[in-house]
Amino acid sequence: IQSTSMDQGILTEDSMNSFIRTLIQGGIWKNKVPKQTARTKDGMQTTVKKTEAEADAMASKDTRLGFQPVVSVDAELLRQQRRFSSPRVLLSENTPLEPPPLYLTEEPMVLNRTSRRKREGKSHRGEYSVCDSESRWVTDKSSAVDIRGHQVTVLGEIRMGSS
């Protein structure tokens, strides 16, 4: 996943909820529980959701084997969702050209407008890779903790378009 620093606006909770609904409707949400076919006593086939424990066991097995899930994302879906700007990341069809520069260390917060204007001029704009909270590059993570404290899977690759 490529990410881009954005200065286009603040991401609201409503816009994020709308984006998540779109992802769910597109069938690409991470927590989609796999289904399996089972036969009842009378021989009829039924579709049964796997239990959460079975799904977790499969995910754990896949992680041990070095498998990282690959999700196909329609490029048009991402183009439609560009209005959901985030100050942190933007899904991009382009790969980053190089690792990002480290953020400039800025002077402590001062409550005066002049220094605020000075600080705003130091922002970096460009394509950024994912890094952890210790500010060192991480390229082999298969799971992470999101901003709400939930454990999530880090995708190794996202295929875009019809290929």
Swiss-Prot record:
Principal location: secreted
| Any one annotated GO CC term | dendrite
GO-annotated molecular function: growth factor activity; nerve growth factor receptor binding
Which GO terms fall under biological process for this protein?
Answer: cell surface receptor protein tyrosine kinase signaling pathway; modulation of chemical synaptic transmission; negative regulation of neuron apoptotic process; nerve development; nerve growth factor signaling pathway; neuron projection morphogenesis
Coiled-coil regions, chain positions: none
Which stretch is the leader sequence?
1-3
Q: Which residues form the propeptide?
A: 4-119
Q: Which family does it belong to?
A: Belongs to the NGF-beta family.
Q: What is this protein called?
A: Neurotrophin-3
Q: Species name for this entry?
A: Charina bottae (Northern rubber boa)
Classification of source organism? Eukaryota, Metazoa, Chordata, Craniata, Vertebrata
